[in-house]
Every structure is written in structure tokens, then in C-alpha cells.
């Protein structure tokens, strides 16, 4: 047994430069995953559900011209675990409806048994993955 046990990831806060567009994007996407908006302010929006939470925060003014760079120090991408392939496919269908930028998928990969995923971007280009894997953690 490990010395310290954790019980999942409590939350992730994403700092965005296009707050209005990001708020609209996440307020339409996250409820599809069963997440409920519990805070919605001028500079911060926070959804809870699925044993985690996702928040978005307006960036400081001096960073408003910047965009997400996947290979810069910091977040590479955010990945949410689906319960079934159908959920990954439903995510794809919804993303098409809202005209989100889909990077790739849904498709299978050999990274892990049963790995099936879709990768897409929010309005700031932050990459989000929804996946299914037969490896249960």
C-alpha cells in the first residue's frame, strides 16, 4: 500500500484568454458529461461532477494576447475518462453540433488495451481528450 492515498483529481482550473467564448463552450460541453455549474462569475466559471471539477478563469490582462501552446511548460492536455465507446461517439457528435475543432478521432490506438478516444480544442486551443481504456485504474 502506498504511504499516501489519493481519491482521484479534485479539480483542474484552466486559465483562458477568450473567456466569453470559453465560458459558452464549457457551459455547453460540461453538462453533457453530467457536470453542474456551481459558480459563474465575471472572471471564473466552475463545474462539478464525475468525481472531479473543471474551472475556467480569465487570464490577467498582460497575457490576453497569448494562446495555448501544447509543448510549452505547463498543461499538455486534459483527458476525461468515458465509461463506454458510445460516450466517446456521443462526444464526437456533440462537438460537431457546436462546431468545435476536432483534432482527431474518434479512433482506436494501441497505447493501452481498448484505447478509444477523441481529441479536440476549446476556443483558446487547449486540448481536451475524452477516452476509454480497458485498463481500470
Task: Show which residues each predicted segment covers.
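Short glycine-/small-residue motifs
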Residues: 129-130
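Conserved small/polar residues in nucleotide/adenosyl-binding loops
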Residues: 135-137
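A short, surface-exposed helix-loop junction/capping segment
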Residues: 4-10
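Long, continuous compositionally biased terminal/linker segments
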Residues: 2-3, 48-83, 89-98
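Core segments of cupin and vicinal oxygen chelate
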Residues: 13-60
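Vicinal oxygen chelate
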Residues: 16-21, 78-124
Amino acid at each position: 500500500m502506498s504511504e499516501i492515498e489519493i481519491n482521484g483529481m479534485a479539480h483542474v482550473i484552466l486559465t483562458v484568454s477568450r473567456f466569453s467564448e470559453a465560458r459558452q463552450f464549457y457551459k455547453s460541453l460540461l453538462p453533457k458529461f453530467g457536470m453542474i455549474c456551481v459558480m459563474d462569475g465575471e472572471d471564473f466559471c466552475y463545474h462539478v461532477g464525475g468525481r472531479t471539477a473543471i474551472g475556467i478563469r480569465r487570464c490577467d490582462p498582460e497575457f490576453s494576447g497569448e494562446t495555448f501552446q501544447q509543448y510549452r511548460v505547463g498543461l499538455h492536455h486534459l483527458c476525461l475518462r468515458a465509461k463506454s465507446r458510445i460516450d466517446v461517439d456521443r462526444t464526437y457528435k456533440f462537438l460537431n453540433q457546436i462546431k468545435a475543432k476536432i483534432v482527431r478521432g474518434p479512433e482506436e490506438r494501441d497505447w493501452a488495451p481498448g484505447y478509444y478516444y477523441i481529441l479536440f480544442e476549446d476556443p483558446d486551443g487547449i486540448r481536451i481528450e475524452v477516452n476509454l481504456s480497458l485498463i481500470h485504474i
